[in-house]
Amino acid sequence: MKGLGSNIVRSLPNGARLVCADNTGAKELEVIAVKNYVGTVRRLPAGGVGHMVFVSVKKGTPEMRKQVLPAIIIRQKKEYRRADGTRVKFEDNAAVIVTPEGTPKGSEIKGPVSKEAAERWPGVSRLAKIIH
């Protein structure tokens, strides 16, 4: 895992629903925790593009539903600024399910993957068809 190049806005707090962008059988995920989050009193933990979160599978195949799994956020609706001054936002909030080490469990990723997530997680960048 590598450090993030730009300052990502943490716009997905606990309880946020994400689209599962891989072929593991999960369709919708809910964020239940953010790994390595250090916050303040009464503030919800939140993650953004490139962060590892723990999710509960809300919709999907019967084998996948109700499981708690680690995932990496690859797209977010809230725009964030890159170091070169450009602003990036996507049309949905999406994540891919991974192992605790960061290698994806699925064999393909649907849709674009943010450059920040691809740089930080080499396993995700190997499966990404579009890096934006």
UniProtKB/Swiss-Prot annotation:
GO CC term (a single one): cytosolic large ribosomal subunit
Transmembrane segments annotated in the record for this chain: none
Alphabetized UniProt keyword annotations: Ribonucleoprotein, Ribosomal protein, RNA-binding, rRNA-binding
Domain of life, per lineage: Archaea
Annotated GO MF terms: large ribosomal subunit rRNA binding; structural constituent of ribosome
InterPro entries: Ribosomal_uL14 (IPR000218), Ribosomal_uL14_arc (IPR019971), Ribosomal_uL14_CS (IPR019972), Ribosomal_uL14_sf (IPR036853)
Pfam name, any one: Ribosomal_L14
A biological-process GO annotation: translation
SUPFAM superfamilies: Ribosomal protein L14
Subunit text: Part of the 50S ribosomal subunit. Forms a cluster with proteins L3 and L24e, part of which may contact the 16S rRNA in 2 intersubunit bridges.
Function: Binds to 23S rRNA. Forms part of two intersubunit bridges in the 70S ribosome.
Alphabetical list of HAMAP family matching this protein: Ribosomal_uL14
Family: Belongs to the universal ribosomal protein uL14 family.
Protein name listed in UniProt: Large ribosomal subunit protein uL14
Biological source species: Methanococcus maripaludis (strain DSM 14266 / JCM 13030 / NBRC 101832 / S2 / LL)
